[in-house]
Amino acid sequence: MSSSPLKVSKLNHDDLLVDDIIHHFNGIAKTPLHSNAFQLSPDQKIEKIASHFSEILHTLGMDLTDESIKDTPLRVAKMYVNETFKGLIPENEPSITQFTNDYRYSQMLVEKSITVFSTCEHHLVPIHGKAHVAYFSTGKVIGLSKLNRLVDYYSRRPQVQERLTIQVADAIKKALNTNDVAVVIDAHHMCVASRGIRDINSSTVTAEYSGKFLNPETRKEFLEFIRS
């Protein structure tokens, strides 16, 4: 790899107006956010969520003085802000560094079986599965782990799988300055497995193809890679 990498800017609240940050979330597959989504700090969000979750547990009939659950509202609030939904905080966007493709590798690069942990925005229960991504370099490459980090960043927010698939594809296009990107996600939805129909065997597959991957032969090659 080249010794003079090109850094792709990472969003920072100090550098961007709220309108700029919201624009980051509002691509073709936008995350539904209200206009004041970034006014509270993470600590303020934790405090507010903990208060509301205490009320939820109390309404359900739980005794919040019990040793086992007295700290549950705060634990849940921290988990929501710092882990489960950390993809809603722009500062958590992965910092991407581009490197020159010194080896002039011109074939398809595939990263498969990337772990996906997300949350269904309809019932707030887990989505878990695998993402498979591929691209053709136009002269720049990024570290392989950055593909995993991009998938994780967009997964860590309330999601529908279709939007997640498009958001990951768009992020890879931006990071690599290429339109030749493919993303397939195969995931299990706990809203299907644990409630309603209670089907524990089904999974949902979504795909987004662009550029060279619109060619049937190229797409076939990619699908053969991820099935092998």
Task: Show the residue positions of the predicted features.
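A domain-level signal for the structural core that forms small-molecule/cofactor-binding pockets
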Residues: 2-228
